Structure formats: structure tokens, C-alpha cells
């Protein structure tokens, strides 16, 4: 997969990972790889991020959980790369090969929860947003959410 595609998936998912010693599988980004797409999933039990990209895909169905620390390291390395990222993994380790770097890390062992079961499938409400319009809208919406969280006892003025 291309470095920019992987960077986008990590950036969109990393904030939703947990810091939970009792549920270690939630402390990373779940890579759900199929022959059609790659889905980046992260959740801390309160928020869920599912980012599906059809630009990249695997040779066969596979999955692994990348811990938060290696994901953060990749987040810092990937902006320096423009080529493809090759991912090789087994049950315990993953190797990320970039043009100028190679990283081997230990994966989180365990089974990630079925994230599709908590996403409504027959939801009658759908929204289609032009990506250019979303870029103009998203930052103010995020600021409002952050402000309301910080001032949850008194509404923001």
C-alpha cells in the first residue's frame, strides 16, 4: 500500500485506541485485510473508528493488531516516504518495509471484537458529502466538540 494511504489510516485511527491493561486488544489499530480493501479499526469502548480504503488490498484475507507505540512511530516516519509500504506479518511480529526504513514490531495477541456488529446495517439515515465541502466544514465542527467537552458544566459562550 502507498505510504500516504497508510499514514491516513493511522492518523484517522490512532486517537481512538485505548490504554486498557485488562483488554490489551483494544490498545492498538486493527488491520482487517481482504482481497478487496483494507480496513483500519480502533476503539476504546466509547468511540469506534472504522476507516476503509479500497486503494489498497491484500492477496488474501488476514488481520493483525498493531500496538499504539509502533503505530505512532510509523505516523512519524510515513510523512518522509512517498513509495509503497510492504507489510509482512505472522502471529507474533510484523515487518514494515519502506524505501528508507524497515521496522519490526511485536503484534498484540488476541481476537479483536466484531466491530461490524455495533454499526447499524439498516440505518435509513444516510449522508453523502462532497470531500471538498467536508474539508471546509470539519475543523469548525471538531472545535465545537472539543469546546463542549472542556466546558461540560457550563455551556460555551
Residue ranges and their predicted role:
Residues 111:
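Glycine-rich, pocket-lining loop/helix-strand segments that form or immediately flank
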Residues 1-52, 56-108, 123-157:
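DNA polymerase processivity clamps
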